[in-house]
């Protein structure tokens, strides 16, 4: 039986096959953050010299990419990318996701928005029927912490400050347990409209286009409907 680490590697390898299909001297690849994204980054090293470069969703990923000799570009200098590859904390059959366990949710949303296709890589344990078992990360401007926490409580959540953590943008994270997420796009908009929220970790208004889920029997590929 494959371990979770081996399943993550399997998912990363499947995404690298997609990179092989689009690689070229003018191609830029968007790269996410997290343990599965780290494996993708390590595999991306073999494309050194075959890509124009990469765009990273966090300082952590940028450092790892640079360590492999891959060019890391400023998103302001990039007009489009064929794919953005990232993991997920949870993903449902609609390819809506909860992300942000690593705290990079805002930059992940920004970088993903510039890519033509969002490729989610994960092991099969991340696939759920309904989002919400994993606490929802919400990036918050520090002065708004308590006001935002009250707003999240009114939505039925139980927000908790992620102690000792500051995002790459200088903000804090509230991890929200207990939310009922029947309408992920609607809840994403509602939370994002709370003054002081930078963004929440629901990726539903713009979810993944393709999910590559590693199973004991190989890769299960899901594509967004419509």
From Swiss-Prot:
InterPro entries: NagB/RpiA_transferase-like, Ribose5P_isomerase_typA_subgr, Ribose5P_isomerase_type_A. It is an enzyme of class 5 (isomerase). The active site is at 108 (proton acceptor). It catalyses: aldehydo-D-ribose 5-phosphate = D-ribulose 5-phosphate. Gene3D superfamilies: 3.30.70.260, 3.40.50.1360. GO terms for molecular function: ribose-5-phosphate isomerase activity. Keywords: Isomerase. The keyword Isomerase applies. Substrate binds at residues 33-36, 86-89, 99-102, 126. GO terms for biological process: D-ribose metabolic process; pentose-phosphate shunt, non-oxidative branch. HAMAP family: Rib_5P_isom_A (MF_00170). Belongs to the ribose 5-phosphate isomerase family. Catalyzes the reversible conversion of ribose-5-phosphate to ribulose 5-phosphate. This is Ribose-5-phosphate isomerase A. The lineage of its organism: Bacteria, Pseudomonadati, Pseudomonadota, Betaproteobacteria, Burkholderiales.
């Amino acid at each position: 039986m494959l371990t979770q680490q081996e399943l993550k590697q399997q998912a990363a390898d499947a995404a690298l096959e997609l990179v092989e299909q689009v690689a070229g001297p003018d191609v830029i690849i968007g790269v996410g953050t997290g343990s599965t994204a780290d494996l993708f980054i390590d595999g991306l090293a073999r494309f050194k010299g075959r890509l124009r470069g990469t765009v990273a969703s966090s300082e952590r990923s940028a450092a790892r990419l640079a360590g492999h000799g891959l060019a890391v570009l400023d998103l302001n200098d990039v007009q489009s990318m064929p794919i953005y590859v990232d993991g997920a904390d949870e993903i449902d059959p609609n390819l809506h996701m909860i992300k942000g366990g690593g705290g990079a949710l805002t930059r992940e949303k920004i970088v993903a928005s510039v890519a033509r296709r969002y490729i989610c890589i994960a092991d099969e344990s991340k696939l759920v029927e309904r989002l919400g078992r994993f606490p929802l990360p919400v990036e918050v401007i520090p002065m708004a912490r308590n006001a935002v926490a009250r707003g999240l409580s009114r939505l039925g959540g139980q927000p908790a400050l992620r102690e000792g953590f500051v995002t790459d943008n200088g903000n804090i994270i509230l991890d929200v347990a207990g939310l009922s997420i029947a309408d992920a796009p609607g809840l994403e908009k509602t939370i994002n409209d709370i003054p002081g929220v930078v963004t929440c970790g629901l990726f539903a208004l713009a979810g993944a286009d393709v999910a590559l889920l590693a199973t004991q029997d190989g890769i299960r590929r899901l594509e967004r409907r419509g």
